[in-house]
Amino acid sequence: IQRRAGGNLLTLASGATLVARAVVLAVGNTPRRIPAARLRGAVRLADAWDYDGVAAIPADADVCIIGSGLSMVDAVLSLDHGGHRGRIRVLSRHGLMPLAHAVSGGADNAPVDALLALGLRDRLRLVRAWTRAANAAGEPWQWVFDRLRPHGQALWRSLTHVEQQRFLRHLVRYWDIHRHRIAPQVAHTLAALRAGDRLEVLAGRLQSVEAGGDGGIT
């Protein structure tokens, strides 16, 4: 990228060039890695998106998945569909799993102006009141979050910087499991694996990963 008067000149790997008034780097999230300082010995690791690596895990091996978000769900389903019989342990700081979608509905917009005028604590109280009212009316709580979906940017930008940081420290994990949900069928599969003692979800912080003499890890 070369900055020029009135714009930017981008040279591609092919040698072709583009001229743009503004350049936005939208490269997505980089893959998260376990810090090398916490790895001891020849530890075998597989990225959740390394399908060949996941498929190569022995069917009877015990598996530990770091993180309990949507990527974890994909990894567990890949193992289960591949006939994995070993126990799967999931470790995350809070041990929270994505919640399930409800049947579609509740498309009317939320009265977002009422939220925009409030601070973070009062917003949380109002959203909780809405979910209680929805339950009392026979509606699933998921509809409340679906109504908020179109207003995510406005809600975020209307918070002060201090409140944004407070949200990231204390609430984002709970927001994520309510907002980024999974299909009911997937939730049923995970529940069945947990009931069958094949899937265990643990809350904790990873301190180290050490290769064992039997090929396992601790």
Label the predicted regions.
Residues I1-A117, V127-T218:
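Flavin (primarily FAD) cofactor-binding/catalytic cores of flavoenzymes
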